[in-house]
From Swiss-Prot:
Catalyzes the first step in the D-alanylation of lipoteichoic acid (LTA), the activation of D-alanine and its transfer onto the D-alanyl carrier protein (Dcp) DltC. In an ATP-dependent two-step reaction, forms a high energy D-alanyl-AMP intermediate, followed by transfer of the D-alanyl residue as a thiol ester to the phosphopantheinyl prosthetic group of the Dcp. D-alanylation of LTA plays an important role in modulating the properties of the cell wall in Gram-positive bacteria, influencing the net charge of the cell wall. The lineage of its organism: Bacteria, Bacillati, Bacillota, Bacilli, Lactobacillales. HAMAP family: DltA. This is D-alanine--D-alanyl carrier protein ligase. It comes from Lacticaseibacillus rhamnosus. Belongs to the ATP-dependent AMP-binding enzyme family. DltA subfamily.
Length: 506
């Protein structure tokens, strides 16, 4: 158990200064470098940024990002990560909500962000080399101060900034390092982008355990040949990803224990782990333990989990998402908010120290999703589950029209909102198509097109996707667009999304 994330990482630097903290394709950075660089950056940030304000950090999978995060934490600032593969619109949308006084350019910004201070890479590098280090951690992020703010999809096309405090993160990290059997010095894969809270599952537990993060940038993961060649060279003990990503790795017949002798832990979150994927991993990696975990960003990465053994795979065609972590209470309610009996489907409620204080600058959405339970915070997950009498939870679906595709959470209304801005579209509605394992296989849009000059639907679809791609993240672009003269409506005049869902999943 640790009592402070920042001092725990600094302690590793004091005890094991030459140990490698971060390895980017063979370029290695030690804990001493991480401490010295983050201390100097913290000194620089303390002088140059307004006290206590959240700061946007723009960049990819690099050591500099981690160093900047830690420098901001030490100087009393929450960080708001935005990945380099985000559309330009995302940066503007986040800033419209966050009103951050500064943007830190670890990688060059693709657009101009008006009325905000920009700290560019040369200034960062100069500060990390020569600025006087921060003289104490008395103003560092602690307790209920925000540690990071991650933006998720929002229903109005406006993303929601989930505020995660130091103590939220501490609760999660302590559970991760105690319940998943990870050892000091663990070598962990660092693949999810920092703007996706799954990245927290590898980042902070690894650093407080004095381990090594092996960066796997998108340029590698997008090229399967390069990915399959790179993975065995990493010497991993721990694999953290969405199930979708490991399903890509399983396409390589050489992805098995004999080529990964030290790989002993698989941790999954972000979407449903299906039975056949778990079975493939258990068969190919007999020395490894497969952990299935579940949790919304609003409750800090994950709140339930369990080891998926051969017995569990044999017993449950649809795998459980595990038991609540010890400091957290989960329970299931019906539409009236009444607790239901064991085995009855309902909405999962989460109460505990890892539940967020709410959405940044969005009191209405916060009031709708969060509640007080005694002296603790609670969150209405919007997830349909069943729970056994002994507390084992099974995921069943969403209560609303929010889905997960490849681990990314997508509000269908958000996609619709943007699709309906596209110049070729009169009206559109997006629905998920599920595969036989109840996972979202693709997004399909039904659209009423405006009059146009395209000689084929294919060309029209290409034009719509190109325009939409300037507004939303790549994973939010529907794979197929089906054209109609009109969309079905409900009795109260809204597009009947349930009818469209039924049509594509018949």
């Amino acid at each position: 158990m640790i009592d402070n994330v920042i001092t725990a990482i600094d302690r590793v630097a004091a005890e094991h200064p030459t140990r490698v903290a971060y390895d980017y394709e063979g370029t290695q950075y030690t804990y001493a470098q991480l401490k010295e660089g983050s201390d100097r950056l913290a000194g620089f940030f303390a002088e140059s940024l307004p006290a206590g304000e959240p700061i946007i950090v723009y960049g990819g999978q690099t050591f500099d990002m981690v160093e900047v995060f830690l420098g901001l934490s030490k100087s009393g600032h929450a960080y708001i990560p935005i990945d380099t593969h985000s559309p330009n619109e995302r940066i503007t949308q986040v800033q419209d909500v966050a009103h951050a006084p500064a943007v830190i350019e670890v990688a060059p910004l693709p657009i101009t962000v008006p009325d905000v201070k920009i700290i560019r890479a040369p200034a960062l590098h100069q500060a990390e080399q020569s600025h006087a280090p921060i003289h104490s951690l008395q103003h560092a992020v602690a307790g209920d101060d925000n540690y990071y703010i991650i933006f998720t999809s929002g229903t109005t096309g406006k993303p929601k900034g989930v505020q995660i405090s130091h103590d939220n993160l501490l609760s999660y990290v302590n559970w991760n390092i105690s319940d998943f059997g990870l050892e000091e010095g663990v070598v962990a894969m660092s693949q999810p982008p920092y703007s996706f809270d799954l990245s927290v599952m590898d980042l902070y537990p690894t650093l407080v355990l004095g381990g090594t993060l092996k960066a796997l940038p998108k340029e590698v993961t997008d090229n399967f040949k390069e990915l399959f060649a790179t993975l065995p060279k990493l010497g991993l003990n721990e694999w953290v990803s969405t199930p979708s990503f490991v399903e890509i790795a399983l396409l390589d017949p050489n992805f098995k224990q004999e080529n990964y002798p030290n790989l002993t832990h698989f941790l999954f979150c972000g979407e449903e782990l299906v039975n056949k994927t778990a079975q493939a991993l258990i068969t190919r990696f007999p020395k490894a333990t497969v952990y299935n975990t579940y949790g919304p960003t609003e409750a800090t990465v994950a709140v339930t989990g369990m080891a998926i053994t051969q017995a569990i795979v044999d017993q449950y065609p649809r795998l459980p998402i595990g038991y609540a972590k010890p400091d957290t209470n989960v329970y299931v309610v019906d539409e009236q908010g009444e607790q239901v009996s064991a085995g009855t489907e309902g909405e999962l409620m989460i109460v505990g120290p890892s539940v967020s204080k709410g959405y940044l600058n969005n009191p209405d959405k916060t009031a709708a999703a969060f509640f007080k339970a005694g002296n603790q915070r609670g969150y209405r997950s919007g997830d349909l589950v069943t729970m056994t009498a002994d507390g084992m939870v099974f995921y069943r679906g969403r209560t609303d029209f929010q889905v997960k595709l490849h681990g990314y959470r997508i509000e269908l209304e958000d996609v619709d909102h943007n699709l309906n801005q596209v110049s070729y579209i009169k009206q559109a509605s997006t629905v998920p198509r599920y595969d036989k394992d109840h996972k979202v296989a693709q997004l399909i849009a039904f659209a009423v097109a405006k009059p146009n000059d395209f000689d084929s639907e294919m060309k029209l679809t290409q034009a719509i996707k190109a325009e939409l791609g300037k507004m939303v993240m790549e994973y939010m672009i529907p794979q197929r667009i089906i054209y109609r003269d009109q969309l079905p409506l409900t009795a109260n005049g809204k597009v009947d999304r349930k009818a469209l869902i039924a049509e594509v999943n018949h």
